């Protein structure tokens, strides 16, 4: 990023944080909300500060035998075809490209892929298409490919994702460091322009990668290598394949959280990193119902895998620390809001209520300050995501925790977004 743009982002962040500190200390002081505000501000400064120091890996990638694995279930036909075409267009050669249909009831997509592969023989010689007779879940679809490949590196791609031509080449630059066992790229919403929800989702994605994963990458411990675009060394996948397929939680089979599960396997071996120059666009839910189902799945995966991460406190304290921070921030927010509503409601006046809403808005702007350069107009929508986060996603997160044993994970029966 040019020095002028980075300076503008840093100065804007300092300005917003200064206002946030003033509002928090002046109006809420040492109350529960005030204490939460201090911890939140500290956490924001740490994450944003680390993200400002982040630099992508450079150099020419080594020679690897790479296999791409694309699981699909009831996917839109054109979307899956575009995914395949984007993988075929990679500047770094792929030895194999596996497309595994996981027992879809709608076979339009896999039929279109088979027709394309049979027609475009010259460019599809390394494409292997497989139809499973029974729907067993994303993990088993991926495992079918993993078991049949002798690749050094596995590239995982979701079936609704367009990866940029140099995405794989950029990701592999991180593997020049032999201590890196998994890497993920930068993700944005392909259908960002569809409606307000997709715009807000794109803002969130940009923060999740450009800030959160950038900060975690600086410590060598990103918590989730995202399904749309990630690479893993063979040593991460093959020795853990049976564990991956048959993972259980509280005595029940696990059918989600595959990305974080694989990332945890990589963390056991070494570093997990983010490569900002490896980019992809993916379809995101544009209806609130589908969006909330997706978030419910992610929340349950977050809590389940967080337990595993915290257990690493002796072997990998940084991973445990990042996880503890996320869990504590969630719990403190619930306590602070509860205290505000039930203990301090009588003391609330219009000025404090306005200040509280202002804090929500400013926190949202702080979190997404990187987006100011990318999409200035959309950046101003950040406070709307702050409201969505506080009044919808946080209660949903609490619901997900309370129903974590429920095996109805919210998977859609039609077009499934595997995340």
UniProtKB/Swiss-Prot annotation:
The topology of this chain with respect to the membrane is: Multi-pass membrane protein
- Which cysteine pairs are covalently linked by disulfides here? none
Its required cofactor(s), as named, are: Mg(2+)
Catalytic activity field: [hyaluronan](n) + UDP-N-acetyl-alpha-D-glucosamine = N-acetyl-beta-D-glucosaminyl-(1->4)-[hyaluronan](n) + UDP + H(+); N-acetyl-beta-D-glucosaminyl-(1->4)-[hyaluronan](n) + UDP-alpha-D-glucuronate = [hyaluronan](n+1) + UDP + H(+)
- This chain belongs to the protein called Hyaluronan synthase
Classification from the root reads: Bacteria, Bacillati, Bacillota, Bacilli, Lactobacillales
Cellular component (GO) terms are: plasma membrane
Q: Which family does it belong to?
A: Belongs to the NodC/HAS family.
Pathway(s) per entry: Glycan biosynthesis; hyaluronan biosynthesis
Q: What is its EC number?
A: 2.4.1.212
């Amino acid at each position: 990023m040019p020095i002028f743009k980075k300076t503008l982002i840093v100065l804007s962040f300092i300005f917003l944080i200064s206002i946030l500190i003033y509002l928090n200390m002046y109006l809420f002081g040492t109350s529960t909300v005030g204490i939460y505000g201090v911890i939140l501000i500290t956490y924001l400064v740490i994450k944003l500060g680390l993200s400002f120091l982040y630099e992508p890996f450079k150099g020419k990638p080594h020679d690897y035998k790479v296999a791409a694995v694309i699981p699909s279930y009831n996917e839109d036909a054109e979307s899956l075809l575009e995914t395949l075409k984007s993988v075929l267009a990679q500047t770094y050669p792929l030895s194999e490209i596996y497309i595994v249909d996981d027992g879809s009831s709608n076979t339009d997509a896999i039929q279109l892929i088979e027709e394309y592969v049979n027609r475009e023989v010259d460019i599809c010689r390394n494409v292997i298409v497989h139809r499973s007779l029974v729907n067993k879940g994303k993990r088993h679809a991926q495992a079918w490919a993993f078991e049949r490949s002798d690749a050094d590196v596995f590239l995982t791609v979701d079936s609704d994702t367009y990866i940029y031509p140099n995405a794989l080449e950029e990701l592999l630059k991180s593997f020049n460091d032999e201590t890196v066992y998994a890497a993920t790229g930068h993700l944005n919403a392909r259908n960002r322009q569809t409606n307000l929800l997709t715009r807000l989702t794109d803002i969130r994605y940009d923060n999740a990668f450009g800030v959160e994963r950038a900060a975690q990458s600086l410590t060598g411990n990103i918590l989730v290598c995202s399904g749309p675009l990630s690479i893993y060394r063979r040593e991460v996948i093959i020795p853990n394949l049976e564990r991956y397929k048959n993972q259980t939680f509280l005595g029940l089979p696990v059918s989600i959280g595959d990305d974080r599960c694989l990332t945890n396997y990589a963390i056991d071996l070494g570093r997990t990193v983010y490569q900002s120059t490896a980019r992809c666009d993916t379809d995101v839910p544009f209806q609130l119902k589908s969006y909330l189902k997706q978030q419910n799945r992610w929340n349950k995966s977050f809590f389940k895998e967080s337990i595993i991460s915290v257990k690493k406190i002796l072997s990998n304290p940084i991973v445990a620390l990042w996880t503890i921070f996320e869990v504590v921030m969630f719990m403190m927010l619930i306590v602070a809001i509860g205290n505000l509503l039930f203990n301090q409601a009588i003391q609330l006046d219009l000025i404090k209520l306005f200040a509280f809403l202002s804090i929500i808005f400013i926190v949202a702007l702080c979190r997404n300050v990187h987006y100011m350069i990318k999409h200035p107009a959309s950046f101003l929508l950040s406070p709307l995501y702050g409201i969505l986060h506080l009044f919808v996603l946080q209660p949903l997160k609490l619901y997900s925790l309370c129903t974590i044993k429920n095996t109805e994970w919210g998977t859609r029966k039609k077009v499934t977004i595997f995340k």
